[in-house]
Amino acid sequence: MAEITASMVKELREKTDAPMMECKKALTEAGGDMAKAEEVLRIKLGNKASKAAARVTAEGIVGTYLSADGKLAAMVELNCETDFVAKNDDFIGLAGSLATLVATKNPADVEALSALELDGQTVEAFRTALVGKIGENITVRRFSRIEAKGQVASYVHAGAKIGVLVDLVGGDEQLAKDLAMHIAASKPKSLDASGVSQELIESERRIAVEKAREAGKPEAMLEKIAEGTVQKFLKEVTLLGQPFVKDDKQTVEALLKARGASVASFVLYIVGEGIEKKVTDFAAEVAEQAAAAAAKK
């Protein structure tokens, strides 16, 4: 068998971007044949990606694209398993590339995005290779695209864990940026009350009625109290009803009216929102591994 030298490992790593140890193992398995070692790595990296696919991806970042004229924008949520990988340059680069593809190619859904070309291969092939290189599952969760009616501002906060796009008609660039920051801070669910689901409103109403009843309020007053509670709730969760973060004496709606502007739409992404994260009990995991090892003896 040919001796596996450091220069051979370095050459294979430069060709494949695979981890050093994986390159050395592949060269050993291939008997020092570089071409065969590349094939071994392709198989192994593919297998690693398949094994990783079952693991929960609740960490990650948002990637954004904004055209120079502010008329076209896109945002992608790219997920991984750990915050460590979310800071990886290749991972960050992929998020940005995907946002650019969404803006310029306008795919219908994640499946269509995965079939687009990126660096001479499909997005899915690129993702699979990166999973193999990094050793963690990576998933494209969602994306949004805006063709502006006015001008789009983008804002990314908290290590790219929160991303905002807002399409402002009228006003100016600074107002658009301020609104994007407001959305990141106040996290509205919709532009106005019409965007809040009736199911959520009725749920808040029922809760308000029961709370008022438990507090001993007269039955005749329950509906009126509940209506007041619902209206307060709607102001809290709608962009137009919220107090503006830079001047809480006025609502966003009042601010826009004073500036002769309106919000055509906005998108808010919070990474991992709604994904159930796996909480690992380290002591229990070690005990489980020890028990499994003992059972093999």
From Swiss-Prot:
Pfam families: EF_TS. This is Elongation factor Ts. InterPro entries: EF-Ts_dimer_sf, Transl_elong_EFTs/EF1B, Transl_elong_EFTs/EF1B_dimer, Transl_elong_Ts_CS, UBA-like_sf. Keywords: Cytoplasm, Elongation factor, Protein biosynthesis. GO terms for molecular function: translation elongation factor activity. Belongs to the EF-Ts family. The keyword Isomerase does not apply. Residues 82-85 are annotated as: Involved in Mg(2+) ion dislocation from EF-Tu. It comes from Azoarcus sp. (strain BH72). It is found in: Cytoplasm. The keyword Protein biosynthesis applies. GO terms for cellular component: cytoplasm. Associates with the EF-Tu.GDP complex and induces the exchange of GDP to GTP. It remains bound to the aminoacyl-tRNA.EF-Tu.GTP complex up to the GTP hydrolysis stage on the ribosome. The gene is tsf.
